[in-house]
Structures are given as C-alpha cells and as structure tokens.
C-alpha cells in the first residue's frame, strides 16, 4: 500500500500538523486519521516526542468509528503501557466497550473513575451517553440535570439536555435550556434559531410571535442562515393567518413573509440555481403568500 507521504508529497511534519488541525477542529474524517496516524506511528515515532501519545489516542478513537477494533486495541495497549492507571486511558477502555455495545463493562469503568475522582466530567458524560444509546432517555435527563447542578456553566451539557427534551416532546423545558445557552452565548445564531423552532412547535399566537422574533435575531447574527430565513417566513405566514391576530399584526407579518420570500429567491440565485429551478422550488411558498395577501385585501 502506498504511503501518504509518497502519494501527496508531504513531510512527516506536514502529517503531524494535519493531525493536530483535525483534533483542534473536531474534524470527523476517521479513515484519513487512521491512514495518516498509522504512518506517523510506524515510520516516524522517534521524531514525534510526546506528540505520539495524543496521536495514538486520536487513531484509536478513529478506529472505533470505523469498526477497526484491531487497530484500536493496539493503540490502547501502547497507551496503557505508557500511562498505567491513567483515568484518561481507562476512559478510552470504556469507549472501546461502548463501541462493542458492552455497556455494563463500560459503566463499571466509569463508576470506578468517579469513585477515585467524583469531579471527572468526562466519565459522567460517558455514562449519560450510554443511557442515550440504550434509549433510556429519562435516566439520561435525570443524570444531566444532576450534572448541571454541579457544572452549571457546561454549555455542551445544556444543549444535550435541550435535545433530549425535544426528543421527549417536552418543549417548555427544552426552551428553558436554550434560553440558558442564549444568556451565556448571546452572539450564537444557532441557539436563537433552535429556540425559535421550539417556540414555533409549541404553537399559539404568543409562541409564534416569539418564534418570529428569534428567527429574525438569528438572521441578524448570521444572514446566511437559510433555516432561520425559512423559519421567519413560515412563522410570519402562520401569524398572518391566525384568527386571533389583529389586523395590524396580520398586515405586518404579510410584509415580513414577503421580505423573506424575496431573500430566499436571492439566496437560490446566488447559489447558482437557474431561474427555472428557483421558481419551481419557491412555487409553494409564493402560492401560500398570495393566498394570505388575498385574505388581507
């Protein structure tokens, strides 16, 4: 099999730096990680210094993704030899058991880690991940809430809890979690968009108004957010057609829907769609808008 360095005319330093970039950007390209990482380990181990251990870990996790337990076990054995008793290496053992669906064995490992170090957040999160993998969402929710009582600033955990509540159709609690995220991340357009989607799903005129406002804010923060743009359109449409909405509210929301339609058209055109494709894609949108305008006239 040809070497990466020969195929792409790169040095071992280039490959090392590429592995670092992939780690830092959480780039999920497991097959490439294995290919590059194995060559670094097999051909350049003596040059890597302490970097070799993080590369072993990186290759192991990628191997689990690809179902290559032989590679994962080889990396794990090297890490165990270098770091006997390490909680981090024990957690990797737990990850391997998870990949094999040996959840009870994985839980035992995480429990032992937590006995030694009750503040080990990685082990607690893996236990929650196992509950989710087993479809035990109620337990995952309970454990996440307990976790957040101690680590209230963990944004990843708040978002995971919001997703679990959404899966359980508990939209009020999901909205609360997303509000917490917005408070700590006021410039993250995705959280505004997701909060808007939850309020839209809850329904009712008040929630629809909130939904439209938060879709609008998501667009202000990122005017390329097409999901928020469509959300602005559809929430405006539903407000304008709501019998409880005032005449002014209906008129304003027809205007918002009209603006959103024009922006969607522009986005399609900028993306290189032909006029025919654009018109076809937007036909249903425009038909609904026309119906609204007739209703308001």
Swiss-Prot record:
Membrane topology annotation: Peripheral membrane protein
InterPro entries with a match to the protein in the record: EMC2-like, TPR-like_helical_dom_sf, TPR_EMC2, TPR_rpt
One Gene Ontology term from the biological process aspect of the record: tail-anchored membrane protein insertion into ER membrane
Keyword terms of this UniProt record: Endoplasmic reticulum, Membrane, Repeat, TPR repeat
Residue spans of the TPR repeats: 87-120, 155-188, 192-225
Pfam families: TPR_EMC2
Gene Ontology, cellular component aspect: cytoplasm; EMC complex; endoplasmic reticulum; endoplasmic reticulum membrane; extrinsic component of endoplasmic reticulum membrane
Top-level taxonomic group: Eukaryota
Subcellular location: Endoplasmic reticulum membrane
Quaternary context: Component of the ER membrane protein complex (EMC).
Function description: Part of the endoplasmic reticulum membrane protein complex (EMC) that enables the energy-independent insertion into endoplasmic reticulum membranes of newly synthesized membrane proteins. Preferentially accommodates proteins with transmembrane domains that are weakly hydrophobic or contain destabilizing features such as charged and aromatic residues. Involved in the cotranslational insertion of multi-pass membrane proteins in which stop-transfer membrane-anchor sequences become ER membrane spanning helices.
UniProt similarity note: Belongs to the EMC2 family.
Protein's name according to its UniProt entry: ER membrane protein complex subunit 2
Organism: Xenopus tropicalis (Western clawed frog)
Biological classification of the source: Eukaryota, Metazoa, Chordata, Craniata, Vertebrata
């Amino acid at each position: 099999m040809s070497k990466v360095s020969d195929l792409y005319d790169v040095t071992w330093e280039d490959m090392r730096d590429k592995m670092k970039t992939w780690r830092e950007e959480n780039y999920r390209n497991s097959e490439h990680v294995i290919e590059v990482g194995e060559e670094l380990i097999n051909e350049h181990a003596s040059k890597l210094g302490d970097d070799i251990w993080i590369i072993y870990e990186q290759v192991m996790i990628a191997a689990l993704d690809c179902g290559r337990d032989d590679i994962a076990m080889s990396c794990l054995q090297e890490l165990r030899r270098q770091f006997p008793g390490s909680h981090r290496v024990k957690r990797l053992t737990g990850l391997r058991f998870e990949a094999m669906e040996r959840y009870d064995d994985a839980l035992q490992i995480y429990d032992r880690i937590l006995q030694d170090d009750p503040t080990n957040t990685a082990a607690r999160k893996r236990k929650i991940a196992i509950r989710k993998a087993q479809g035990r969402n109620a337990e995952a929710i309970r454990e996440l809430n307990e976790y957040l009582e101690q680590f209230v600033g963990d944004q990843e955990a708040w978002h995971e809890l919001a997703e679990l509540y959404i899966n359980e159709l508990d939209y009020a609690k999901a909205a609360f979690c997303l509000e917490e995220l917005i408070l700590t991340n006021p410039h993250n357009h995705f959280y505004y968009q997701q909060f808007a989607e939850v309020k839209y799903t809850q329904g009712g005129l008040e929630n629809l108004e909130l939904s439209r406002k938060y879709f609008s804010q998501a667009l202000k923060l990122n005017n390329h957010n097409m999901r928020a743009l469509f959300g602005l359109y559809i929430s405006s449409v539903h407000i304008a057609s709501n019998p409880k909405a005032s005449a002014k509210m209906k008129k304003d929301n027809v205007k918002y829907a009209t603006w959103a339609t024009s922006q969607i058209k522009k986005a399609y055109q900028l993306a290189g769609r032909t006029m025919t494709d654009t018109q076809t894609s937007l036909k249903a949108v425009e038909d609904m808008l026309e119906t609204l305008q007739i209703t308001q006239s």
